[in-house]
A protein has these predicted regions:
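N-terminal cap/lid segment of alpha/beta-hydrolase-fold proteins
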Residues: 1-11
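Active-site loop/oxyanion-hole signature of alpha/beta-hydrolase fold enzymes
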Residues: 7, 41, 51-93, 97, ...
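Conserved HGGG/HGGXW glycine-rich cap/lid loop of the alpha/beta-hydrolase fold
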Residues: 10-64
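Active-site acidic short loop of glycosyltransferases
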Residues: 18-20, 45, 86-88, 241-242
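Structural signature of beta-strand start/N-cap positions in the alpha/beta core
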Residues: 22, 48, 89-91, 116-117
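Conserved alpha/beta-hydrolase "nucleophile elbow" surrounding the catalytic nucleophile
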Residues: 27-29, 94-99
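Flexible "cap/lid" loop of the alpha/beta hydrolase fold
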Residues: 114-170
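Conserved serine/cysteine hydrolase catalytic core
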Residues: 192-252
Length: 252
């Protein structure tokens, strides 16, 4: 599996498999490229898949944190990858944070030129909520979402001397997981996932596995991105003149 050299000298891991028409898959926050295999591996004889592991996850877990915010950094990394396939147009599957990265690339770069068709899953074109746009991330629960993220940010700032979740004191680790559980419960209540997380939360030895990332500095970087994000990609999506499908909304 190849690693691609990024502008800052870090090596981004991209899972590649299959043969045929190229498909670029952009994962959501906390995902690793192998998690797509149950859905995509069966199509390997017809398509060649390219699935980057974002910095901090999977094969890119040891990449250093850049100075840019997470979405700008992801687009810079993705654009560097695309430069090595200058004449290639991909079927694009973009999920959650990966969809934000795709929209960012359409708005600020030439990502549209690399898109043959586009599947957009579970992401709003504008994360923030204001008087002009009520359909941001979590919509009417957006303020609650921001409070949870700020609580996690404050906790991480108070424990900046630690590198990993396992380095935290038991009480701090429990509080961190408690805040993450609140985030999970915000997504769908009631839900089987939330119930499973609640049971895991009650088991001390399982708590750290509830978190999508074990490095605290990366966790802080990603969360800060969602706290600060003010981009509006609606005009970018209007520019997209390729076949596109959107799975988005409360019941998607």
């Amino acid at each position: 599996m190849p690693h691609y050299l990024m502008p800052d000298g870090e090596k981004l891991y991209v899972r590649e498999f299959g043969q045929g028409t190229p498909v670029l898959v952009l994962s959501g926050l906390g995902m690793q490229s192998w998690q797509w295999l149950p859905f995509l591996y069966q199509h390997r004889k017809k398509y060649r898949f390219y699935i980057p592991d974002w910095r901090g996850f999977g094969g890119s877990a040891q990449c250093k944190i850049p100075t840019l915010d997470a979405i700008s950094s992801h687009w810079q990394d993705l654009n560097c990858f695309l430069n090595q396939y200058a004449d290639t147009a991909f079927h694009v599957i973009a999920y959650s944070m990966g969809a934000t990265t795709a929209m960012h690339g359409i708005q600020y770069g030439h990502f549209k030129d690399h898109i043959r068709s586009y599947l957009h899953i579970d992401q709003t074109p504008k994360i923030s909520v204001d008087a002009d746009w009520l359909h941001g991330l979590f919509a009417e629960k957006h303020a609650d979402f921001k409070v949870i993220l700020q609580n996690i940010t404050d906790l991480l700032a108070q424990n900046a001397q630690y590198r990993l979740v396992s380095d935290l004191t038991a009480s701090m680790r429990t509080e961190l997981v408690k805040q993450w559980l609140a985030f999970i419960q915000l997504q769908a209540t009631p839900s089987r996932t939330a119930a499973l997380f609640q049971k895991a939360f009650q088991q001390i030895h399982l708590q750290k596995f509830m978190l999508p990332i074990q490095r605290l500095d990366y966790m802080a970087w990603y969360i800060q991105n969602y706290l600060d994000h003010q981009e509006d990609y609606r005009n970018a999506l209007r520019q997209l003149d390729r076949p596109a499908t959107f799975f988005i909304g409360e019941d998607s």
